[in-house]
Curated annotation (Swiss-Prot):
GO terms for cellular component: cytosol. It is found in: Cytoplasm. Its cofactor is Zn(2+). This is Alanine--tRNA ligase. Catalyzes the attachment of alanine to tRNA(Ala) in a two-step reaction: alanine is first activated by ATP to form Ala-AMP and then transferred to the acceptor end of tRNA(Ala). Also edits incorrectly charged Ser-tRNA(Ala) and Gly-tRNA(Ala) via its editing domain. InterPro entries: aa-tRNA-synth_II/BPL/LPL, Ala-tRNA-lgiase_IIc, Ala-tRNA-ligase_IIc_anticod-bd, Ala-tRNA-synth_IIc_core, Ala-tRNA-synth_IIc_N, Ala-tRNA_ligase, Ala_tRNA_ligase_euk/bac, DHHA1_dom.
């Protein structure tokens, strides 16, 4: 049996099916574009889901893919098992061949058997097949094609061998192919008590979609039967490299050996598990970041953070003192960058995110581990860590719950999940949003039906501002209607063609007017559904509008021109950011509005004022050069080869529109643009800020809006000059003088306030109340700065060794509490506790401080009348 590399296995699989007239479909992003209920793509069929359900048509009926997939949870792939078992992974590649109404069971089994035994040269006596127990048809094909006897065809009664999308929809029996690693390895055939052993390993699963589930008890035969298969690349490579553990294949071993050379710890004992975790999680983290996911505390970003922090903890276990993961990235890019060029394109950004996250986590990792050690010292095997401690590790030290569980796993200590969740609910500001699906299946089906009946909307707006179009559908309150009669009714309108641009690619939709006979419709927005249906959001202004009639569609030309200007400027900005900030910059989001543009980029630090000036200068230089803007349609592959920028994770058709601006910018884009860069006029950045870790937001204006901005600033400047009775040449000096004078006045005011609050020892003795052997002095004051109240209270408690000083300052709708306690009595009376209790009494949420000095707030001014009583009760029980 020939030994194949991972790359050769992938290549041979794809080449084999291409030779058998399958279309090679590139992998989709890990972020599913067609299933809002799914967090990540976890199998090869996800990108074809709408094809299988009949909601989408493709120009091919047979396909082959090598699909990036990710599983980071669930009963079959718990994160805690990754690295410790032979075949659990977060990121993996799923090889698959698919038929959409073309071939079925016999041909699928033939393709699989022929590839395994002839192309991959697997011994026939090492292979077994499982079938669903009632699928006699599949059994007959296995006997005919492979020559299997009944002893090699295993009938399975459970749903492991019957697949469905849900309670309704396409479904069908499965047939799995198992490989026998040999009797020297423990394990039994599928369906036996020893089936969980490692001897017999599933290497290929074929789903025969032949039924449609109508309801719980009813299924019918499909008129168009389909095939969905999946072969895990890592599993298959392990078989072909004669190893029984996926982590021993060439791809993982290269990463593990590279890591070993850096950390200088041998790959043996417990360390080998850490090396495997790091190798697996490096792939998952890097591909997620390349597809646009940023570590955060919710949704996909939180899954990424969990994976990253688990790998970082294992790097810590190997003794890595400095960030490690980003140092391993070049090796991964070297191994997989040719097959997945998004890794190469995003390498600098991935490296930056990996390093930053590790630096951020290292700051708290050791302290969190120390707390965990202290809290579990008295726990023994079978005990449970409290949910409160687990939550503190999560909230304060950044330990995801499954990381805490992973650490305690070796000691057989569990975590109180219920207690953890209770703590999570109590701290709402730390709660993460749950991942929710759209819940709009009825509405989704409406749009699929429209697309099925009428097809895509033809967009005319690249060359026309107005056109005669046929109205093919009207929608009101999510229902199709034949006409709209009520004036000022809001509704959706679909036509066979339109000059209106539907919001997509960051560019918002057009507005304008539709005229039909005696009717007039105002278009207040234009949207795009299912990628190709252009939907006009309308208000009826006059007459009646009907399905089937022709109408004149006219866009607001000035509105469109301003959109063109800002969209073209966005392309130029993108190119200049690459030049000024670096090639790692990728687009994370954008908004093209008629009055401004917003552009989100991957960049790990703030853009400096100097860089902003340089960016503005370069963009304006390109505008002044008045480059011609050309658009062409070409194959996606050709466009990318020519250097056209594409968005990671974005789904493109086989043919794309490429927008070229001189030699400056080349991007895939379906938006509307100016004819020459000079049409933009001018460009000005208005703000730059952070919106997430590693993501910066730039906002800018162009053309007439730059002039408007300059006029507003000029008007503001003149108002300031008038108010300060100066001119712009003397303005800075005048402002600095005012600021200096203000500082002096503030200092004088501070001295005055402190003097007014100061008391002699005799005055304290006279004014203070005697309570349980100590003195209590309470004063209500006006809206005085907290800093002054702190200083005044501290000064008084230094003069008298048994004093509790309480100030309550009343501001506009709020109260400020200051409590100071003489240090000689802090063993009995704690300023922090007193301040917090007063705060809660006065409607606040508690404050903070030390035993001798603390401050807090409140807002229930009405309760001040009872403050004396509250103070007395607090001190008599202290």
């Amino acid at each position: 049996m020939t030994k194949f590399t991972t790359e050769e296995v992938r290549s041979k699989f794809i080449t084999y099916f291409k030779a058998n007239n399958h279309t090679h479909v590139p992998t989709s992003s890990l972020i599913p574009h067609n299933d809002p209920s799914l967090m990540f793509v976890n199998s090869g069929m996800v990108q074809f889901k709408n094809v299988f359900t009949g909601q989408e048509k493709r120009p091919y009926n047979k396909a082959v893919t090598s699909q990036k997939s990710l599983r980071a949870g669930g009963k079959h792939n718990d994160l805690e098992n990754v690295g410790y078992t032979a075949r659990h992974h977060t990121f993996f590649e799923m090889l698959g061949n698919f038929s959409f109404g073309d071939y079925f069971k016999e041909q699928a089994i033939y393709y699989a058997w022929n590839l395994l035994t002839k192309e991959f040269e697997l011994p026939k006596d090492k292979l077994y097949a499982t079938i669903y127990h009632t699928d006699d048809e599949a059994a007959s094909y296995w006997k005919k094609i492979a020559g299997f006897g009944d002893d090699r065809i295993i009938k399975i009664k459970t749903n492991d061998n019957f697949w469905s999308m849900g309670d309704t929809g396409p479904c069908g029996p499965c047939s799995e192919i198992f490989y026998d690693h040999g009797e020297q390895i423990y394990g039994g055939l599928p369906g036996t008590k020893d089936e969980d052993g490692d001897r017999f390993i599933e290497i290929w699963n074929m789903v025969f979609m032949q039924y449609e589930q109508i309801d719980k008890d009813t299924s019918i035969e499909l008129s168009q039967k389909s095939i969905d298969t999946g072969m895990g690349l890592e599993r298959m490579t392990a078989v072909l490299q004669h190893v029984n553990n996926n982590y021993n294949i060439d791809l993982f071993q290269e990463i593990i050996n590279f890591t070993e050379n850096i950390v200088k710890v041998k790959v043996e004992g417990e360390a080998k598990f850490s090396y495997r975790v790091i190798a697996d999680h490096l792939r998952a983290s890097s591909f997620l970041i390349a597809d646009g996911v940023i570590p955060s505390n919710e949704g996909r970003g939180y899954v990424l953070r969990r994976i990253m922090r688990r790998s970082m903890r294992h790097a810590h276990m190997l003794g890595a003192k400095e960030p490690l993961m980003y140092k391993l990235l070049p090796k991964l890019v070297d191994l997989m960058g040719n097959v997945y060029p998004e890794l190469k394109r995003a390498e600098r950004f991935i490296s930056s995110i990996l390093e930053q996250e590790e630096i951020r986590f290292k700051a708290t990792l050791e302290r969190g581990l120390k707390l965990l050690t202290e809290e579990t010292e008295m726990l023994t095997k079978g005990n449970e860590l409290s949910g409160e401690v687990a939550f503190k590790l999560y909230d304060t030290y950044g330990f995801p719950l499954d990381l805490t569980e992973d650490i305690l796993k070796t000691r057989d200590i569990s975590v109180d999940h219920k207690g953890f969740e209770e703590q999570m609910l109590m701290q709402k500001e730390r709660a993460r949003k749950s991942w929710l699906g759209s819940g709009e299946s009825k509405t989704d089906q409406l749009w699929f039906d429209i697309k099925e009946q009428h097809g895509s909307t033809e967009f005319l707006g690249y060359t026309l501002n107005e056109a005669k179009c046929k109205i093919i559908a009207l929608i009101k309150n999510n229902n199709l209607v034949n006409d709209i009669k009520e004036i000022d009714t809001q509704f959706l309108l679909i036509s066979n063609q339109t000059p209106f641009y539907g919001e997509s690619g960051g560019q918002i939709g057009d507005i304008g007017t539709i005229f039909a006979k005696d009717s007039e419709v105002e278009v207040i927005d234009t949207l795009k559904y299912l990628g190709s249906i252009i939907v006009h959001k309308c208000i009826l202004k006059k007459g009646q509008i009907n399905v089937g009639e022709n109408a004149n569609f006219s866009i607001d030309i000035r509105y469109r021109q301003n959109l063109r200007i800002h969209h073209s400027a966005t392309h130029i900005l993108h190119a200049v950011l690459h030049e000024v900030l670096g090639k790692h910059v990728t687009q994370k989001g954008s908004l093209v509005a008629p009055t401004y543009l917003r552009f989100d980029i991957s960049h790990s630090k703030a853009v400096t004022n100097e860089e902003i000036t340089l960016i503005e200068d370069k963009v304006n230089e390109i505008i002044r050069d008045n480059h011609e803007v050309n658009t062409t349609f070409m194959a996606t592959e050709d466009a990318v080869k020519q250097g056209a920028m594409a968005l990671f994770g974005e789904k493109y058709d086989s043919e794309v529109r490429v927008v070229k601006m001189g030699e400056t910018s080349l991007e895939l884009c379906a938006g509307t643009h100016v004819r020459r860069t000079g049409d933009i006029g001018c460009f000005k950045i208005t703000s730059e800020s952070a919106i997430a870790a590693g993501v910066r937001r730039i906002e800018a204006v162009c053309g007439e809006f730059v002039i408007k901005l300059m006029r507003e600033k000029d008007s503001l400047l003149k108002s300031i000059e008038s108010s300060l009775k100066t001119n712009k040449n003397e303005l800075i000096t005048k402002v600095n003088n005012i600021l200096e004078r203000n500082k002096e006045v503030e200092k004088e005011l501070e001295k005055t306030h402190l003097a007014s609050l100061d008391l002699s020892i005799e005055q304290i003795e006279k004014q203070a109340a005697q309570i349980t052997g100590i003195k209590l002095l309470y004063k209500k004051v006006g809206n005085i700065d907290n800093k002054i109240l702190r200083q005044a209270a501290e000064n008084l408690t230094k003069k008298v060794e048994d004093l509790i000083m309480v100030y309550i300052a009343e501001g506009i709708g709020k109260l400020s509490i200051t409590v100071a306690v003489s240090k000689a009595i802090t063993d009995k009376y704690n300023a922090d506790i007193i301040a917090k209790k007063l705060s809660l009494f006065l409607g606040g949420s508690g404050g903070g401080g030390q035993a001798s000095l603390a401050q807090a707030g409140g807002n229930d001014i009405g309760k001040l009348t009872n403050i004396h009583k509250k103070l007395y009760s607090l001190l008599t029980v202290s």
